[in-house]
């Protein structure tokens, strides 16, 4: 028992040090990114257009992913894991596929109605046609980042429950690195380079998470074979998700 306690304590210290290191890395790379933002983008109308296109998918990320993952998905997943781990794995993928569908649909709507969205949320851009069109082009590129970051939140939550803390805490570092590299390499097209770097970073994050999830023997499926057994859990999830969505939406 004494040896087991020492082992568990050492694991906690190791996980804490990994998370702390990644948080520090995120702060440092974020600081460097912001310096390069100021240097290459400056403070002008086009930079305002990029910041709008950058912030909108992140706003939806906070509404969809952050609150619902911590307060809704994780407790239900942990509970199902205790009952039946195989069915719990199907629960993961049902929720994963649900978020994929809803974020893909939202991205499609933004693609179709991006001009109307900008007119509604940033009416000041209407005063300058070039800024408005620039923001429109950037938003069409950046908004699908919501798909990757939301799906990454689902898989990160699973890894955290399984005690795998390194990659989930490293994801923001990956995004910052891609944005930094894009700014350095594509100086003349910095705004569009940053927009595309978000998509490439999001895709990279998701691939790495899939690899890590696969390493603990959790593989993608439709999850539909367990839909009957999970009906109660799914009802709870969607009910709580709706409440979380309304609460997060009001706050944002």
Language-model features, listed with the residues they occupy:
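Membrane-embedded alpha-helical bundles of multi-pass transporters/translocases
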Residues: 7-252
């Amino acid at each position: 028992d004494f040896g087991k306690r020492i082992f568990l304590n050492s694991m906690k210290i190791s996980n804490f040090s990994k998370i702390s290191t990644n948080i520090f890395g995120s702060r440092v790379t974020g600081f460097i990114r912001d310096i390069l933002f100021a240097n290459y983008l400056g403070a002008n109308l086009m930079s305002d257009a990029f910041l709008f296109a950058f912030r909108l998918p992140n706003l939806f990320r906070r509404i969809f992913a952050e609150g619902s993952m911590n307060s809704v998905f994780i407790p239900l997943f942990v509970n199902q894991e205790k009952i039946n781990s195989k069915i719990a794995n199907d629960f993961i993928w049902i929720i994963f596929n649900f978020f994929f569908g809803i974020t893909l649909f939202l991205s499609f709507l933004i693609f179709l109605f991006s001009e109307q969205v900008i007119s509604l949320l940033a009416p000041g851009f209407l005063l300058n046609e070039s800024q408005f069109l620039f923001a429109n082009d950037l938003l069409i590129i950046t908004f699908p980042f919501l798909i990757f970051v939301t799906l990454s939140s689902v898989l990160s939550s699973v890894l955290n429950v399984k005690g795998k803390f390194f990659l989930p805490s490293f994801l923001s570092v990956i995004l910052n690195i891609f944005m930094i590299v894009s700014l350095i390499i594509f100086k003349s097209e910095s705004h569009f380079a940053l927009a595309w770097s978000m998509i490439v970073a999001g895709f990279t994050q998701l691939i790495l998470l899939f690899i890590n999830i696969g390493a603990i023997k959790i593989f993608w499926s439709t999850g539909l074979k367990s839909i009957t057994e999970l009906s109660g859990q799914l009802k709870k999830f969607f009910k709580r998700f709706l409440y979380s969505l309304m609460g997060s939406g009001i706050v944002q």
